[in-house]
Regions:
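Vicinal oxygen chelate
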Residues: 1-6, 30-83, 93-118, 128-147
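Conserved active-site tyrosine of GNAT-family acetyltransferases
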Residues: 19-24, 96, 120
Length: 147
């Protein structure tokens, strides 16, 4: 190590099950670890792209208060986004769509797409290497919402 190493990006989530469905099941990240803290009333989940633990995402879920009220998070585009390189942008977007995820910015150019997590975190997907040739149905799809 040269004095510093990137570890992870942490995002707060409001529903750990919906978030795991999105990040693990739909997006295809691998679950590295999960820690449920009864005393601290929180859950920490670490995930990473398959075969690459060097860039991890930490999902932090703060359990509801004893009265049942959940913590609300507000954010905006000032956070920016989390980005992943994928082997096949079209197959990745199709898998996400098959899991009910809206493709906010379809990969019309065969290179880039955006989706949002259940908590509204913008996720950029970039085709690894050269862009794929434009293909339907993606090439003619319009943007949906903000990304």
């Amino acid at each position: 190590m040269r004095g510093m190493k990137y570890l992870h990006t942490m995002v707060r989530v409001t529903d750990i099950d919906a978030s795991l469905h999105f990040y693990r099941d739909a997006l295809g990240l691998e679950l590295l670890s999960r820690r449920d803290s009864e005393a601290g009333r929180y859950t920490l989940v670490f995930l990473a792209a398959p075969g690459d633990r060097s860039a991890q995402i930490e999902l932090t879920y703060n359990w509801p208060a004893p009265d049942g009220s959940a913590e609300a998070y507000t954010g905006g585009r000032n956070f920016g986004h989390v980005a992943y390189a994928v082997d096949d942008i079209y197959a990745t977007c199709q898998r996400l769509a098959d899991h009910g995820v809206t493709i906010n910015r379809p990969p019309r150019d065969g290179r880039m797409a955006f989706v949002r997590s259940p908590d509204g975190i913008s996720i950029e997907l970039l085709q690894a290497g050269a862009a794929l040739a434009p293909a339907e149905p993606w090439a003619s799809m319009s943007n949906v919402g903000s990304w």
